[in-house]
Amino acid sequence: MIEEASKQKGAVTGIASGFIDLDYKTAGFQPSDLILVAARPSMGKTAFVLSMAKNMAVNAKIPVALFSLEMSNVQLVNRMIVNVCEIPGEKIKSGQLAPYEWGQLDYKIKELYDAPMYVDDTPSLSVFELRTKARRLVREHGVKIIIIDYLQLMNASGMSFGSRQEEVSTISRSLKGL
């Protein structure tokens, strides 16, 4: 394994996130990786993971599953449209677009539609439910990356814990087993 990596000379050996510095430091996401993106509220975690999902599914055509425990499919798709179009969000939301921007918007929406991205916005998803859905997506669509937005809203149904921290820890361990 180390010998194989040395032949790659710093190349991405896993799945590229589309963020050059991150890919350089991690060599891409490897099949056994569980990566947690954590930060204080309103720091851009959702925007970051949506950008990675877009880079993987739209640009690299890698099948991605995105489980959002906080936002609806519509909210996520709207954010992704703004992300891929490179048109200010206010203009898209208001519909005040120049003719060339309508064309750009149409093209980018088609790109998103054609991308191998599978979004699930089931609220209060349990670890068991997520694992079941994720395994089905892997089996039926060849999903290679699973992104969970807002892990703290997930529950470990049927189990009791002394603290929420213990529950999140158990959820994380269970997800690693995916």
Language-model-detected regions and their locations in the chain:
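Pre-Walker A segment
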Residues: 1-33
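Cytosolic-facing regulatory segments adjacent to core modules
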Residues: 24, 55-142, 156
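Short hydrophobic/aromatic beta-strand immediately N-terminal to the Walker A/P-loop
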Residues: 35-36, 65
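The conserved Walker
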Residues: 41
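Conserved lysine of the Walker
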Residues: 45
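A conserved segment at the C-terminal end of the G1
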Residues: 50-54
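Substrate-engagement module of ASCE P-loop NTPases
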Residues: 55-58, 167-178
